[in-house]
Amino acid sequence: MEDWKPLLDAIGSAGRVSAMTGAGVSTLSGIPDFRGPQGLYKNPDAERIFDIDWFDRDPSVYYRGCRELVYGLGEFSPGPVHLALKRLEDAGRLDGIITQNIDMLHQKAGSSRVWEVHGSPILHHCRRCGAARSFGEVMAMIEANGGAATLGEPYVPRCSCGGAYKPDITFFGESLPEVAFARSQELAANSDVMLVLGTSLTVFPAAGLPRVTLQRGGKLFIVNAQPTPLDDFAAARYSDLAEFAAAVMSAFPAGR
């Protein structure tokens, strides 16, 4: 058992607390890490699946590669870290969440201040006319045409104008969501404590956000199974996310 007292004391006493989450948080819900041994990036077509030029050329590459991973996200439930962060928000001890994940599980857990720096499939937009559809609407279109896991050529949901619907996930060749990243920078700059959870801090520019907290005099508490470039600068370093969640739930009981 790791010593969580320094982290819990900091959460309890800090003026402003934020959290930054990565793939490790969602693997506890059963969602594979894109960069892990069984992840999407082991797919030989990985670079094309999330490439905006490829999507505009042939959107079926994306819908083939992600029909189960992205359009099966509705089957997953929030894990212990998602629920622990919701508990901290309810206790008035968390000002916001910056997430690199696209699975929408923080919102599913009930967290209200979530900034998705790599975007989210919660909305899809037509690449031709810009019309918007919700994740649920696109899912309904996919299910009506064979479902997410159907073998053979994937169904590509299209607008009435003929354009393909693309999720608001940031593809290679696209900029990060402007509003979400600006709000994330503001949150990081104003944090007395940032909890860095389940991310190895290797994907920029998002990985630079904890540095903003450090530069402004804030403290980092890192919980990640693998080393990160900022371990030596953290106030404390831990490895077990499930233990972190249990410690938070114990220290901040519901209703208090």
Where is each model-derived feature located?
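Conserved catalytic core of sirtuin-type NAD+-dependent deacylases
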Residues: 1-256
